[in-house]
Amino acid sequence: MAVLVSLACLHMVPAHAQSTAPRNAHAALPEVVVSGSRQEQAADELPLSYDVINANTLSNQQSRNLREALENLPNTSVKRSPARFSVGGATASAGRDGNVGINIRGLGGNRVLLMTDGVRMPRSYAFRTTTFDREYLSLELLKRIEVVRGPASALYGSDGMAGLVNFITHEPADFLAVGKGETPKTLGGRIAAGWSGDDNGHTLAGTVAGQASDTLQWMLTATTRGAHAMDNMGTNHEPNLNRTRPNPQDDRDNAVLGKIVLRPHATQRHVFTLEHVQKKSDVDLLSSRNPLPLRGTPAQIAGAIVDEYSSRSMERNRLTWDARFGLGTDWADHLRTVVAYQDAQSRQVGTSVRNTLPLRVRDNSYGESTWQAGVQADKILRSGGWAHKITYGLDHVRSDISNLYTGLAPLPPEVFPLKRFPDTRETTSALYVQDESVHGNWSLTPGLRFDHFSLDVTSQAGFYPPAKQPGQSLSGSALSPKIGVLYRATEQWSVFGQYAAGFRAPDAGQVNGYYENAAEQVIIIPNPDLRPEKSRGVELGVRGRLDRLSLDAAVFGSHYSNLIMDTVLIRGTGTAADPRIFQTINTERARITGFELKGQYDWGRVAGGRLVTPFSYGKARGVNRATGKPINSVDPAQLALGVQYDTAAWGLRLDMRHHAAKTAKD
């Protein structure tokens, strides 16, 4: 059992943000989301489970990273590995990948689709002790975070098997808006600064936005953050394997977001976006050093680590043109086109100084360059008392994926430079359609998407040889249906249900990954016969919007087939004559079930301020249906409970989180 209590959110509130009238659950404007249906829609009209975290919440919670932003959501978590990258020594198997990915309802990593303004973010990549995470973002650039729990492939395709998270960035209008009767702004912005004691981190961000004319708005945001190692309760400061204090660490994050919004006509809107995110971390791995004086066999003394240090860097650049047209034709009321180019590069460099053996260096990199294009139309039709909003379109995504391993003193029989998998182009083309039908208090939303995907090797250079066989290409297709139902029982209560299918195509590293280590008698071989993972999910839920209480509750169950398991031992005893052979394989079926609830209670005005209690609880359990064993990626139950007090000038928030123990049956 673990309990975490934080008193982290003493914040200043602008005077105009405080209402003097009593507020209930409906006082604010209805929350609008785009991720649940690919259209702007009132969140409570969605027949599925969702979460929206807006910029005010991120600021008031003083969230510094993705883990902190999502930590109060039910059945949602972010894995953190604070030790970062290392080369050898005792920390070789320790985590070194930062906030590696989001887990939704028991599955995470690349099974959760991450997007920024609807553009797919890079995948994570892991191979043995090298891991590249997915946190290519800065929270200071975000207007809100939208989370959809459950399969999302019917609208977004591969990787949306467990759910999706869409990071939506600010626009100029967010800083130029004025109240009723006030003079319109031609210039606006904000400045934000922060400090955190647990990692001695500091943040500075600034935004300036302007209205150049009636048809043109612009915005520029820049942010920087510096931090050191996360503090802990360790007491041993020794610079060797016995150390329990954090290793010295220096983190630097920088990000820039620029936008131009052009409205040449009342029925047109064009948004041009430039986003740049850069992160770097340097670690002095004192905990890898061998204690002095050196002891052991002559070979152990020769290879003893006397110094070790590493660096990790990542950079993402994005250009997007997002255009919307009002048509009013027989086939479409509106048309949206998106063209985006994104380049992401990650690099990890580690250096081990050994006692008498040669210097060991590992310089590993991973990159994705992606073109994404989409066309989407919608049309409202009426028939027999039903109103239909038809949304249909096509998506095309092409990613060139590369990796490179180089350095000094490779393990035999490897010779640097080399590639763990060949240069690969992943391509996906898809058609989708959705019909949101409304009749009285009922809403019915069926949808269907067809994806064709291919994984094509573009170059064998650096991979074959030394690999025993050339990399193989792979292709396939998937059909992802869904249907959702929403019934508005009263003005305060509604119930909903959804069935949705999802899938995830195997990636380049899983299909063609190769590794050989003669000293350990280990070989990892490719598997060009991998099949896509598939999921089928059902959920039932209820929503209540009362004067004081806001409540969402849902039960869910998902069935998975062809789950891909990385580096599974398939044969071998670990001798020179019979080395251990590992391979990424498809496994049997699995099932994850659970329930969740969230909401808040508004106590009203207390001593001149407003007192609110937010809460959430989630519990899930997963079983491998072939072996009967639990699925370890499913988190134990978590309860989050808070108290938030806001006045016109300042606010105070107390959060408590309780994590149940992970038992053998879990």
Predicted regions and their residues:
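Extracytoplasmic beta-strand/coil segments of soluble accessory domains associated
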Residues: 67, 71-120
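N-terminal periplasmic accessory domains that precede
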Residues: 31, 66-69, 100-103, 115, ...
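Gram-negative outer-membrane beta-barrel transporters
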Residues: 438-444, 453, 550, 555-564, ...
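Periplasmic-side early beta-strands and strand-to-turn transitions of outer-membrane beta-barrels
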Residues: 173, 187, 194-203, 207-310, ...
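Membrane-embedded beta-barrel scaffold of Gram-negative outer-membrane proteins
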Residues: 193, 227, 333-350, 488, ...
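Short acidic/polar hinge/loop motifs at secondary-structure boundaries
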Residues: 102, 120-151
